[in-house]
Amino acid sequence: SITKIKAREILD
């Protein structure tokens, strides 16, 4: 799912 990837790059 792309949502998880987006969340990851935000909190990275």
Curated annotation (Swiss-Prot):
Mg(2+) is required for catalysis and for stabilizing the dimer. It catalyses: (2R)-2-phosphoglycerate = phosphoenolpyruvate + H2O. Pathway: Carbohydrate degradation; glycolysis; pyruvate from D-glyceraldehyde 3-phosphate: step 4/5. GO terms for biological process: glycolytic process. It comes from the Eukaryota. It is found in: Cytoplasm. Glycolytic enzyme that catalyzes the conversion of 2-phosphoglycerate to phosphoenolpyruvate. Dimer. This is Beta-enolase. It comes from Thunnus albacares (Yellowfin tuna). The gene is ENO3.
